[in-house]
Amino acid sequence: MSNKIIIAIDGTSSTGKSTLAKRLAKKLKYLYIDSGAMYRALTLYAIQNKYISKSHFDSQKLIEDIPNIHIDFQYNQQNNNYEVHLNNNSVEKHIRSLKVSNLVSQIATVGELRKHMVKVQHFLGSKNGVIMDGRDIGTVVFPNAEIKFYLDASLELRAKRRYKELIEANYKISFYEVLSNIKLR
């Protein structure tokens, strides 16, 4: 029997949930799962299949496609991190774009999609020694997690964190675009 537990890190967007979770997972040698990345991967799938754009969202088509969508996390030895994979392809670099950021909240509000994602998160969390971060992780997904954290920060600090992350990933974007996006989320 394993002594490893589920650790849930919850909070508002761009507060450092993933940074804390990754560091803690490395230190404890736990599996790290970024639930926000899962929703971003689902959003990327919807964009690639033209189910969603700024002007339309065909949630029914996306729901019908659920059996064809496989999201998981695989360890990348080169960068010493777990990366989100969509249908066996790493999409880590693609899911952080502003386009995905601007559409992910629409995906997350569809009840049937949320139910499916929670089911996948429960499956991933059933493995011993998991640290999962994201909104609602400690309240909805794993309300009985052995350890739970909640992170929050000012709007400006959250925008600064996200802006720095995007600039480091070579996205061409202004701070005010990021700030506006964070306000919406």
Model features per residue range: what roles?
Residues 7-9:
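Hydrophobic anchor at the beta1->P-loop junction of P-loop NTPases
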Residues 14:
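Walker A (P-loop) phosphate-binding loop of P-loop NTPases
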Residues 1-4:
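Phosphate-binding P-loop
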Residues 18:
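Walker A/P-loop
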Residues 25-34, 48-53:
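Post-Walker A helix-loop "phosphate-sensing" segment adjacent to the P-loop in P-loop NTPases
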Residues 38-129, 156, 160, 168, ...:
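ATP-dependent small-molecule kinase phosphotransfer cores
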Residues 130, 146-150:
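Short, well-ordered beta-strand core segments
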